[in-house]
Amino acid sequence: MPSGPPVTSASSPDSDAPASTSSDARASTNGDAPASTRHRDIVVLKGVRKSFGETEVLRGIDLVCRHGETTCIVGGSGAGKTTLLRLVVALDKPTSGSIYVDGVDIVPMSERQLTDVRQKFGMVYQYAALLDSINVLDNVGFPLVEHTKLSRAEIRQRVVEKLRILELDESVLTKFPAELSGGMRKRVGLARALMLDPPIVVYDEPTSGLDPVTSRAVDDLIDDTRRRFGVTSLVITHDIASCFRLADQAVLLSKGQIAARGRPQELAHGDNEIAEDFIRMSGIDVDAVLAGRTRR
């Protein structure tokens, strides 16, 4: 089948100043972002390129992440996913192009200004980056110690509140990471990422190395977190099944370029040859995965 142009999303970065979203309006009574802000463009990349020496790793990336939605960046090893992630969360700068977060171009910012930008992102890594030498209370409360002047009692209260929402009770507070199951570690790591109430939560390979049942449970947790906290989710993954279950917007990255993008149904049943090959090599039952989507 001939390869046509990439499937495109309904939104494209075609304005100089993307609409910003007030973080005060993130949550609604049912946990979703309110309709008035849900479709604002909270992260926008325009013509982003990144080179390391003579090697161009990202080639003209245009991307829009909408407030309250889940965008999944999927691709194989070497596609450029990790580099793209580091640029979005302000850990590195592009060689050229613009990156807007909440309507503001972060590329020209100083390191001091970028420190504030980074607090807009809650990071959940493939392996929950918990400190083995301290208990759950101190692990989860660490961002509050670093960035606020709250008392120990106030920090404990906020930690307990977050853990309860994520279905963990106070009995875990005194446990150390080595005592936690894999699922509990994921939840504890997520609680820590949410402590500063970031509008955007970024998941780096959340289902890597997990069996299908556990992967589905993690997907459910990601979507439940989006609904309960009213956050925008950005998921970096090689797992096309997870991507199709979660995404409002699925973006296939290949050789540093966006090869296809759109709703999962569009990628699954479109006429893009690169997407077809990636799905076929994954070996998934596309229709079964789409039938079990967390998002409708």
Predicted regions and their residues:
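Conserved ABC ATPase signature
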Residues: 176-180, 184
